[in-house]
Amino acid sequence: MTYVIAEPCVDVLDKACIEECPVDCIYEGGRMLYIHPDECVDCGACEPVCPVEAIYYEDDVPDEWAAYTKANVDFFDELGSPGGAAKVGKVDRDVEPVSSLPPQGE
């Protein structure tokens, strides 16, 4: 099990979670952040600092955002396991359902 970032993060990208993550497993996509499921150690440090409450334990993701569990896995299909977001930097792409969403927060 791991933590998942869901739709409230889209077009917000606050990044407070990145600063809290002790293992650097939160990667920046084009429109939202993604938690690497193999690099996350399930510490939960990211969850309480998210100002839009977009981070959930995998088993607790609300049904309306269930697709984001798969999105957090799919984002890393091309990227693999680079061993830390800092060495990768921003990855200017997103996966479904994020890539097909209209701009959020407007």
Curated annotation (Swiss-Prot):
Keyword Transport set for record: yes
The protein's required cofactors: [4Fe-4S] cluster; [3Fe-4S] cluster
Keywords, alphabetical: 3Fe-4S, 4Fe-4S, Electron transport, Iron, Iron-sulfur, Metal-binding, Repeat, Transport
Disordered, as annotated region: 84-106
Cofactor note: Binds 1 [4Fe-4S] cluster. Binds 1 [3Fe-4S] cluster.
Residue ranges of domain 4Fe-4S ferredoxin-type in the record: 31-60
Residues given in the record as [4Fe-4S] cluster binding sites: C21, C40, C43, C46
Binding site for [3Fe-4S] cluster: C9, C17, C50
Pfam families given in the database record: Fer4 (PF00037)
Molecular function terms, GO-annotated: 3 iron, 4 sulfur cluster binding; 4 iron, 4 sulfur cluster binding; electron transfer activity; metal ion binding
PROSITE patterns in alphabetical order: 4FE4S_FER_1, 4FE4S_FER_2
Lineage top rank: taxon: Bacteria
Keyword 4Fe-4S found: yes
PANTHER family listed in its UniProt record: FERREDOXIN (PTHR42859:SF2), OXIDOREDUCTASE (PTHR42859)
NCBIfam families for this protein: FdxA_Actino (NF045480)
Function: Ferredoxins are iron-sulfur proteins that transfer electrons in a wide variety of metabolic reactions.
Protein name per the record: Ferredoxin
Record organism: Saccharopolyspora erythraea (Streptomyces erythraeus)
